[in-house]
Amino acid sequence: MNGVDDKTEVREYFNATGFDRWRRIYGDGDVNKVQLDIRTGHQKTVDTLLGWLNDDGNLNQITVCDAGCGVGSLSIPLAQAGATVFASDISEKMVGEGKDRAQALGLMQNPTFAVQDLEDLSGKYHTVVCLDVLIHYPSDQAIDMIKHLASLAEHRLILSFAPKTFLLTILKRIGEFFPGPSKTTRAYQHRESDIAAVLESCGFKIQRSAMTSTRFYFSRMLEATRN
């Protein structure tokens, strides 16, 4: 299936059955063991990223584009820390949930939320972040997407993806990588060397990396800055 069909599938999923499932996973209510494991893994990735940005000590001076923001798990704490955040997602329902969560915390104007495809994002930002989104893109589409996101980043681009390793490929094939009850869209893995090569071709150098592994959640994260 081509990239357009994948995108349509993702949009429809996260605006229908997937919305309630992932809203609960990215919340703090009761969930099943698999969903709790995924929640824990995703939060570890978010916490690692927040730690990286906080270490720089300039969050209140930078703009951040959270591309594929979901329900605002990253956008909201970034705004609370002082960053000016533009948050977008392909799912109208996910964006609506993100707005509600932000406003419940008194964040009325920051983050700025928008329903938008990654391909349609424009503007310039100090930092562009794309967490756990490339899993929806096959390799050729992911390369094009990374190039596009790189064009928006004035200083830094941070990506996370499901790494393509022998072990994880085997796990995926036997149905343990993304269990049916928790994920029903296609799950694409990517080689870290391919991601790094694209970043370097766009004039970026990898500065930091991290790996989050739980039983059902695997995410490799790379931070790259312009040379």
Over which residues does each language-model region extend?
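Class I (Rossmann-like) S-adenosyl-L-methionine-dependent methyltransferase catalytic domain
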Residues: 2-57, 63, 71-121, 143-144, ...
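Conserved S-adenosyl-L-methionine
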Residues: 68
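A conserved beta-strand element that flanks and buttresses the S-adenosyl-L-methionine
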Residues: 129
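Short catalytic micro-motifs in class I SAM-dependent methyltransferases
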Residues: 132-133
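A short His-aromatic
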Residues: 136-137
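Short glycine-dipeptide loop
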Residues: 152-156
